[in-house]
Amino acid sequence: MSGREGGKKKPLKQPKKSNKDMDEDEIAFKQKQKEDQKKLDEMKGKAAQKGPLTGGGIKKSGKK
């Protein structure tokens, strides 16, 4: 038995599944996810413009 034969055998690669067999519900779900992601990105952009929300809390002096 040579050194190359030892170890775990790799399984044969499976062919990729085609995404052509999606029904209307899956297509609608994907479209809704894209729209939600766009809205989330817009909200992130607006939040970044306004600056941090903190600043009114208790401030620590840093001294001990």
Curated annotation (Swiss-Prot):
Coiled coil as UniProt keyword: yes
Gly residues: bias regions: 53-64
Coiled coil regions in record: 21-50
Domain of life where this protein originates: Eukaryota
Key words of the record: Coiled coil
Region of interest: Disordered: 1-64
Basic and acidic residues bias spans: 27-45
InterPro entries recorded: TMA7
Family in the record: Belongs to the TMA7 family.
Annotated protein name in UniProt: Translation machinery-associated protein 7
Provenance organism: Xenopus tropicalis
Protein encoded by which gene: tma7
